[in-house]
Amino acid sequence: MGNVPGKLEAEEYGAMNGRRGGSQKQFRSLSQSSTASSGSAAADSGRSRRATSLVGNLLSSGGVSRAESYGGSAYRRRVAREKDRLREQHALRLVVRSEETVDGGYLAPYGSYRLEKLDYDAPVVQGLIVERRLAPFYTPLQDFDEGWTREELVRVVDSLLLHAPFEEEPEEFEGVPLGNLGVADIDALVDKTLSRREQRRQRSKIFRARLHRKRILWQEEENSKFLELKLEARRTGVSSACLPSDDAKWDLYRNGAECPICFLYFPEPMNVSRCCLQPICTECFVQIKRQEPHFSHDEVDPAQPDEDKDPDLLISTPASCPFCATPNFGVTYKPPADRILGIQGGPPSSYVSACSDPPHHHTEPPPRRTSVAHDHSSVVTSDMIRPDWETELIKERTKLARRAANATAIHVSNRLVDPGHTRGYSNSFASASSTYASNSSMTADFEEEMIRHVMRLSLLDQQPNATSISPGPVDR
């Protein structure tokens, strides 16, 4: 690319001499008129070659150099396998297990929402449930009848499953090869005749289809264990320690409360929004999260291309309350003092109800209390269950900064090899000496601009975690 100007000059000379019959006189005339500027033109050409070389380095530094330094496609395959391993590990944590019980609920969700919606930090949520700072994932009732007797309610609870039934054959995975689920490597299932982009898409779809099938098998295994425990307790009259007694079932569900978001019935107490005191089940709470990184409409023109925007203006807006739209959504939870069961509590099978009074239903709303600040020690916020939100924001800023640097390099490269440069060369060749100063200054500006972007992109590549990019203003 650095030799482009010289090549264009040679072609221009050839075209001029061909049109004029190869006259040596014409060529000598042009040569003599340009003798004074030949030295300066050579210097300008050298500067242009350096500048265009910088463009090449800038365009390749974001991809080729990193690929070479990390082993190219082998590195990308390792990264893909590691991501798959983490996704599978997360899905395994979402399996409901009968022995992982807290106060009559569980550490994993019932399954009212799809896997894509359950992208919270599972260890963090499970820790909050064990600490009794967040309500457990209760198995919900589709309906609740105030007229149910104790025996009827216990029978309904006995019929509940650990997890909602899965869709066996989702339409999106129809015809997708699964292979041997016991073999982790799925590259052999990918059609190698496809383009690289299509191969990546197919690989992602195969992985998701296999993961869906694995989740079904994992949960079916736990469901079978749970059913066997129930049958054994019915046959012998001795319940497993993790199975709730009839008193526990009665006390849990006799005052069922409806979640105003999913409209399912759950045992009380439930989580309560910190701002407007509305009840919300844990499975609905973990769906609520910050907006994806975006630009503020007040500071950035929406019509402006993303690569022209300042990456530091990219923001992540805190989640708002789904009931009253208060920012920094969070909940509080007051665990039942007389029903500490399961992990860090007594065996659910030995629970005995403190009283046998008939169920009472609140006819008056609970007394109001003031809201609690989002940074209060008793509040669990949406950000707490997704602690990597700031890292994701910085990654998006880094990605945008790299795109902007590449776009600038391409723009500068196009200006260096402007077609107008060759068209006007023969007309202005005689006056090259007078225009050299301005051309040299322009090329120097290009070179300085590219050096800045090369250095910026180099910093981004040297620090993959984007610590070199200032986080800028972050909404909390």
Curated annotation (Swiss-Prot):
Q: Where located? A: Cytoplasm
Coiled coil region boundaries? none
Annotated region (Disordered) at 1-48, 351-379
Q: Single GO cellular component annotation?
A: cytoplasm
Biased-composition ranges, Low complexity, are 28-45
Question: Could you tell me the keywords of this UniProt record?
Answer: Cytoplasm
**Which InterPro entries does this one have?**
Sip5/DA2 (IPR039301)
Gene Ontology biological-process annotations: cellular response to glucose starvation
Point to the regions of Basic and acidic residues compositional bias: 358-377
Signal peptide span: none
Functional description taken from the UniProt entry: May negatively regulate the SNF1 kinase.
| Assigned protein family | Belongs to the SIP5 family.
- Protein name as it appears in the record: Protein SIP5
